[in-house]
Amino acid sequence: MKINTLQSLINQQITQVGHGGQAGRLTETNPLTENSHQISTAEKAFASEVLEHVKNTALSRHDIACLLPRVSNLELKQGKAGEVIVTGLRTEQLSLSDAKLLLEAAMRQDTAADG
């Protein structure tokens, strides 16, 4: 899935739910009607798809500050210049707001590399 398509899906789900705290999904299931407390296959697929785009992305200070309450969900490393880099996920879920922020960071990095 292209990064722009994934970003559109995230924005659509945030609009549908009304906030970004909900775990993202790759299917058309309505997060408001699901009652399961288990991590669904769609949530795992969503997190995996986002990770594919954001792995090895350097985060800004603002990104880190926004992710701080949930930073334990991410695998991070320090780059050679002291930057914080996303290397993986420690959970099989990712909130819509975190996914949106991480994809925006990946887009910034891609734009800077192309510039």
From Swiss-Prot:
One of its GO terms (molecular function) is protein tyrosine phosphatase activity. Induction: At 37 degrees Celsius in the absence of calcium. Pfam families: YopH_N (PF09013). Residues 27-39 have a biased composition (Polar residues). Residues 19-39 are annotated as: Disordered. It comes from the Bacteria. SUPFAM superfamilies: YopH tyrosine phosphatase N-terminal domain (SSF64449). The keyword Cytoplasm does not apply. InterPro entries: ProtTyrPase_YopH_N, ProtTyrPase_YopH_N_sf. Keywords: Plasmid, Virulence. Belongs to an operon involved in the translocation of Yop proteins across the bacterial membranes or in the specific control of this function. This is Yop proteins translocation protein M.
